[in-house]
């Protein structure tokens, strides 16, 4: 009779290899492009604390990204000072996000209005937020036809500012779908141009 289906398994993580991978990526992009290292879910099992510490010491990344506020708080507790985006800011976590100098990903109107209200109550001024746009992944993100509404909401407050905009390229790793990827990029470019004409502050 089998007493257990579990076997002892050990994964050895070469942190220098992660850093070298980032260097390879950075070598193929313009210098003005900033790099985000996604360390959510314990850095996908590699150890978020160890990975973040190492990457902050060696450089090469401009931001870390985590899934929820608690992950970002833990990195701050460990002394990580690099900017951190929270990709799924939970209701009720907004004050903790701001007190820990984390930056929320905002992907719908309800979330935008809620975070602005929290930022105003907190006394924030031009607090950095990131806007995600749906260009074809159809999970989360503002649609292109919401640009004017987003701008109207932002024009009514000084509590937040847009730090960056981004999208999720759904099939970028499939060369046969390059046309779809280019359409996604074209949509994001249209959104970017409209936002740059209207917003008073630069963004990524």
Task: Cite the ranges covered by each PLM segment.
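Alpha-helical scaffold segments that flank or form the walls of functional sites
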Residues: 21-23
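Conserved PLP-enzyme active-site core in the AAT-like
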Residues: 28
């Amino acid at each position: 009779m089998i007493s257990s289906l579990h076997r002892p398994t050990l994964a050895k993580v070469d942190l220098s290899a992660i850093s070298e991978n980032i260097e390879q990526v950075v070598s193929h992009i313009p210098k003005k492009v900033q790099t985000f290292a996604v360390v959510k879910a314990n850095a996908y099992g590699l150890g978020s604390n160890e990975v973040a510490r190492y990457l902050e010491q060696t450089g090469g990344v401009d931001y870390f990204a985590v899934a929820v506020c608690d992950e970002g708080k833990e990195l701050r507790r460990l002394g990580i000072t690099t900017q951190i985006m929270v990709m799924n800011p939970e209701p009720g976590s907004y004050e903790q996000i701001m007190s820990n100098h984390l930056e929320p990903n905002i992907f719908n109107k309800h979330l935008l209005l809620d975070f602005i209200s929290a930022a105003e109550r907190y006394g924030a001024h031009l607090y950095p937020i990131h806007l995600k746009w749906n260009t074809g992944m159809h999970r989360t993100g503002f649609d292109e036809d919401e640009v004017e509404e987003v701008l109207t909401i932002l024009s009514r407050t000084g509590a937040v500012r847009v730090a960056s905009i981004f999208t999720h390229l759904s099939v970028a790793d499939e060369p046969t779908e390059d046309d779809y990827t280019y359409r996604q990029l074209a949509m994001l470019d249209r959104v970017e141009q409209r936002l740059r004409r209207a917003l008073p502050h630069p963004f990524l």
